Amino acid sequence: MRHTILLSIVVIAAFTGCGGQTTRTTTPPKAKTMNCTLDICGDKKIQNPTESDIRQAVFALDTKKVDAFLILGPTDMTYIQTGGDQNVGFKLEYQETDTKHHYRANRDLTADEIVKALVAYSTGADESKTMAEWDLVRW
C-alpha cells in the first residue's frame, strides 16, 4: 500500500510539476540570414553586407555623380534593388526567380525606408514587402 501511494505521488508530481506553477515561454525564432551580395553602382560588391554596410551604401548614393543604384540578392534573378538618392527619393523593386515576378513600389521611399527594406530582405524578413504597395512590372 505504501508503495502504491508513493508511486501515485511521484506520478502526480511528474505531471503537475509538484504543484508549482510553470510558465512556458517560447523564444521567437531568429531571422535567417540570406547569402546575399550587395552590388553598389556596378562598381563594388560586398558579400553578406552588414546593416552598417547597407546604410553607408544607401546614404552615399548620388544621382548627380554616377548611376546611383544598389542591388541586393542571392542570385541574378532573385533580388531587391533601389535607385535614387536623398534629394530625389528612391525607387524600390524586387524580383523573385524570374521577370514574371518583378514588382515596383508604387511610391518613392526615403533613405531610411530603403535601409530598413534592404536590411529586412538580407535577413529573410518579409518586412521589406510590407513597406509599400507593389505593382507588377510587365516587360
Question: What spans do the regions from the language model cover?
Answer:
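Short glycine-rich, low-complexity/disordered patches
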Residues: 63-77, 126-139
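Intrinsically disordered, low-complexity regulatory segments enriched in Ser/Thr/Pro
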Residues: 79-109
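Bacterial signal peptide processing site
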Residues: 19-21
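Positively charged n-region of N-terminal signal peptides that target proteins for export
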Residues: 1-4
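Negatively charged, low-complexity tracts enriched in Asp/Glu with abundant Ser/Thr
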Residues: 27-73
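Mixed-charge, Lys/Arg-enriched low-complexity segments
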Residues: 104-139
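Hydrophobic helical h-region of N-terminal Sec-dependent signal peptides
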Residues: 6-12
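C-terminal motif of bacterial Sec signal peptides marking the signal peptidase cleavage site
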Residues: 14-17
